[in-house]
A protein has these predicted regions:
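Short loop/turn motifs at secondary-structure junctions
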Residues: 36-40, 109, 155-160, 262-264
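Histidine/acidic residue-rich metal-binding segments in metalloenzymes
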Residues: 65-81, 85, 105, 134-160, ...
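Charged catalytic cores and adjacent phosphate/nucleic-acid-binding surfaces used
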Residues: 1-15, 26, 31, 174-271
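Divalent metal-binding pocket/active-site signature
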Residues: 48, 112-195, 199-214
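Residues that form or immediately flank small-molecule/cofactor binding pockets and catalytic motifs
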Residues: 91, 166, 270
Length: 271
């Protein structure tokens, strides 16, 4: 049976440094979920666990230095509403040296967390500038980071891989993005998708990154996730909304992707 979107697992509050929207409060986020008739929404502000040593290079310290647990926990306790779950989580980065910005102990206190391996605009923190400059470099780093991440002992049942495709991966250029996605294809990606499926980690379909004006790029993205589906991966949807206007496109874009992939309930990652 056709899957109808019933959740949004990637939402930032005004507390995320790249938001700054005073109207993007937990109460507003919950109301959005209620208005959409969702079964669940997740608050996932950018976060670096202060108990995890941060590599002191590039973009990271300036961005993450103040986005620690005392900062993101200012949103607690989350408001509640009958009929919808409101999950407390975070979005964390994996750096170029393989450090994931959250400890297992902190993960135990959260309902859900997103791990990004593809914030490739954060040069010299998540990727070396010389690797970010070419499709070949980005493709290699994406595969290397995914392979390493999947060796870690983590509570995969409540973790999602954020925006594996999109402008963070492709630099905002459709042709460049398509070339990166072409280069990651192959037996290695198949192996990694199968391992991700076996571990039970969710794969995000990030509706903020779907660009439907370029047919070649859209098809490349659909093909990438169709391959993940063939390998047994399960998916969740995230608007990546940083401001109120980020909510407006989520259902329509997500449903288009769900239909393109032929998703059913069996393909959906649940927390």
């Amino acid at each position: 049976m056709r899957y109808i979107i019933d959740h949004d697992f990637h939402i930032h509050s005004g507390g995320s440094m790249c938001s700054g929207d005073p109207n993007q409060t937990p109460a507003r986020i919950l109301q959005y979920g209620v208005d959409e008739g969702f079964a669940a929404v997740a608050l996932t502000d950018h976060f670096w666990d202060e108990t995890v040593p941060m590599p002191m290079g590039g973009w990271g310290p300036d961005f993450y230095g103040s986005q620690n647990y005392p900062h993101i926990s200012k949103n607690l306790p989350l408001p509640s509403h009958e009929g919808i779950r409101f999950l407390f989580g975070a979005e964390v980065d994996m750096t170029l040296d393989g450090t994931v910005g959250i400890s297992k102990e902190r993960l135990d206190t959260m309902d859900f967390a997103l791990i990004s391996i593809s914030h490739f605009h954060c040069t010299d923190f998540t990727i070396r500038a010389e690797d970010a400059a070419t499709p070949e470099g980005r493709a290699q780093v994406l595969l290397d980071k995914l392979e390493l991440l999947l060796t870690y002992d983590l509570p995969w049942h409540k973790l999602g891989l954020a925006h594996l495709t999109g402008q963070k991966l492709g630099g905002g250029d459709p042709a460049f993005h398509c070339e990166v996605l072409r280069l990651v294809k192959g037996e290695r990606l198949t192996h990694l998708f199968k391992k991700a499926a076996a571990l039970g980690v969710g794969i995000e379909l990030n509706t903020a990154t779907f660009r439907f004006g370029d047919d070649a790029e859209e098809q490349a993205v659909v093909d990438f996730y169709a391959h993940a589906k063939e390998c047994g991966c399960q998916f969740f949807f995230g608007s990546d909304a940083h401001r109120e206007d980020g909510f407006t496109y989520h259902r329509a874009r997500g449903q288009r992707m769900a239909d393109a992939l032929g998703l059913t309930e069996a393909d959906i990652f649940r927390v």
